[in-house]
Amino acid sequence: DAENVNKTPMSISANLDTLTLRPGLDMRDAKLNAQTGISGLSLFTATGSADDGSPLSAAYDATQPGGATVNVESGNAGFITQALIGADFLEGGKLELTGKFTKDASPATFDIALTDVRMRNAPFLTQILSLASLRGLADTLGGEGVLFSRIDVPLKLANGRYVVTGAKAQGPALGLTTSGYMEGKSGAIEFNGVLVPSFGMNSALGGIPIIGDLVVGRDGEGVFSLTYAISGTLEKANVSVNPLSALAPGVIRRIFENPSDTRIPEAKLRAPDEPVPSELPPIPEESFE
């Protein structure tokens, strides 16, 4: 019967003109291999190209007992990030995403690496550069864009919260670190980190033993660097920069930072005898200057 057919293991291989990975993201000239088991899809690989002609591959593996892994590689990081999350401020570059989903209640974890990508008209970064009186960099960001040779983003996802801890962006003109979270439903955000202008030259002292550790502080930071914070929502956020932190060595600069809450919220379970509400409670309005 139909139920038994759905549980029958199958192997599929196909060459497809178009494979829709998700709405807005199609793979052209795709070579597809997939396997299903009694629990559903167990293995999936697809290689092809994106709409702009750049190479694109995706893989999913649920054959291991610990959970499932996912891998996405693209020859155009800007195109993929726009298709996946609607981010239109990245151009070009390469992207590699690896992730793991566990079978228990642990958060899903992802590591995202982008290389040789250009950032242009990023709203929050433009505000940070302006508040830091880095007008030249702000103008470049709004014009040809700022080049980052590498961006690394460690990401956790659970209960609707996207948590970033220790993300780094490095380029000849600018370096950044950031940690914080975004709530998927409400769009609430809270991030903070360090901004390093002239990153290549500014962080060179980090290679000096002992002295480098003292004045630079942490990996991804430089001698002259400013701390920043973003809080509010995606639509309306408060951006602040601490100019005094630019004068402090790396270790002392920790005093000026206000670490964001990067905890994963625990899911609240409903008691068995508690009735299911007919409607959600109103969300309190918050204002951010």
Regions found by a protein language model. Give the residues of each.
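Surface-exposed, gly/pro-biased binding rims or lids
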Residues: 196-239
